[in-house]
């Protein structure tokens, strides 16, 4: 029987997976795997973070040099949790992921996986660029259970 790796994977989250946000429960459910909060951090690269679709989904767009250094949280996760995050983010169909350098609040730099959108309508670049995502009453995130099943978020980016 092949042995599973016990090495943890660092993941940077900037949207609904952060503490206090609508999908944070994904990181706290034991059945999804293991996740441990490491600390808060900021991307070294500037990228546009926008809110899009009728469901108010935060998107980190693959457009280097635009936008801001993005604030978020770093977690160490096991392979099972990483696979479940891939399911949540619909990787590689909707979101892609890559390793980027993140600066922790103590100025230590670490390499982390983060999810971002590579193919998107240019219209998203006209939205306000955020430094950090927070779910708000003005732009409330809509859970998958509240969405129209006939409208895929990936088809709704121009909304």
Q: What label would you give each PLM region?
A:
Residues 2-159:
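Glycine-aromatic micro-motifs
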């Amino acid at each position: 029987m092949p042995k599973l790796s016990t090495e943890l994977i660092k993941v940077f989250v900037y949207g609904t997976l952060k503490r206090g946000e609508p999908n944070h429960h994904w990181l706290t459910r034991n059945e999804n795997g293991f996740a441990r909060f490491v600390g808060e951090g900021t991307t070294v690269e500037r990228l546009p973070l926008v809110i899009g679709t009728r469901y108010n989904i935060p998107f980190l767009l693959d457009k280097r040099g635009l936008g801001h250094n993005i604030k978020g949280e770093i977690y160490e996760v096991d392979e099972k949790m990483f696979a479940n995050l891939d399911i949540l983010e619909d990787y590689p169909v909707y979101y892609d992921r890559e390793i980027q350098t993140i600066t922790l609040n103590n100025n230590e730099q670490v390499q982390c996986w983060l999810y971002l959108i590579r193919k998107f309508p240019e219209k998203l670049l006209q939205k306000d660029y955020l430094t950090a995502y927070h779910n708000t009453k003005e732009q409330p995130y809509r859970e998958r259970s509240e969405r129209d099943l006939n409208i895929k978020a990936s088809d709704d980016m121009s909304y």
